[in-house]
A protein has these predicted regions:
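Generic alpha-helix detector with strongest preference for long hydrophobic helices that associate
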Residues: 4, 10, 14, 21, ...
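Central antiparallel beta-sheet cores of small beta-barrel/beta-sandwich binding domains
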Residues: 26, 30-111
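Sequence-level preference for short, compositionally simple segments enriched
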Residues: 3-4, 42, 48-49, 122, ...
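Generic detection of intrinsically disordered/low-complexity segments and helix-coil linkers/edges
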Residues: 12-13, 65, 97, 119
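Hydrophobic core residues within well-ordered beta-strands of beta-rich domains
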Residues: 19, 42, 118-120
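Amphipathic/hydrophobic helical signal segments and adjacent flexible N-terminal regions
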Residues: 1-37, 47-49, 147, 153-181
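Beta-sheet ligand-binding and adhesion/scaffold domains
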Residues: 81-181
């Protein structure tokens, strides 16, 4: 899908408007056969200085592993961005249009102590109430090896656990993940 396919969809997504402050994310990785291999949650802290968006992403995986990724994203023009991160190879490039972002980059993944280079084609879609959905297709040498599905949330007013929303009182949200079934 081309970014222009979402040009009239609202709410409008601009990374520098969405990511400053605290964001929560929950996601999973499915292999090319549709098997869920990992689940995770992330705490994301973002700052925007008028030119660069800095994101610190702290991941907690269902196996207890923790990981940190630090992004520096520059706005190139009205709708285009370039970014780098500690495990991204070269420069990530993206374009916002309407409520969506098309984002592509190469990354070094640590798989059981072995690093492999893969390509991400990521599509993000801003929804109402601070929710953003993301689907990233991961490929190696042009062959899809899996998909990461993510949900981002801003302005949380509910406690979230592995089984879902439990109450509607404002509270701090903590990651809790159970084993993959």
């Amino acid at each position: 899908m081309k970014p222009t396919n979402c040009s009239n969809l609202l709410p409008q997504l601009l990374l520098e408007d969405y990511f400053p402050g605290k964001t929560k994310a929950w996601g999973l990785f499915e292999d090319r056969f549709g098997n869920v291999r990992k689940q995770f949650c992330a705490d994301i802290n973002g700052t925007w200085n008028g030119k660069e968006l800095c994101l610190s992403e702290d991941f907690l995986y269902s196996d207890g592993k923790k990981e940190n990724r630090n992004w520096t994203i520059k706005k190139i023009d009205k709708n285009r961005y370039e970014g780098s991160a500690n495990d991204v190879i070269g420069i990530a490039s993206g374009e916002c249009c309407g409520n969506s972002l098309s984002w592509q980059y190469d990354m070094r993944l640590n798989i059981s102590g072995r690093f492999i280079s893969v390509h991400f084609t990521d599509r993000m879609y801003l929804q109402s109430d601070g929710v953003m959905l993301s689907k990233a297709r991961i490929s190696k040498l042009g062959v899809e090896i899996g998909v990461v599905t993510l949900t981002f949330m801003k302005n949380l007013t509910s406690e979230v656990h592995d089984t879902g929303l439990r109450n509607t009182q404002p509270t701090v949200v903590e990651c809790e993940l159970g084993p993959i079934q």
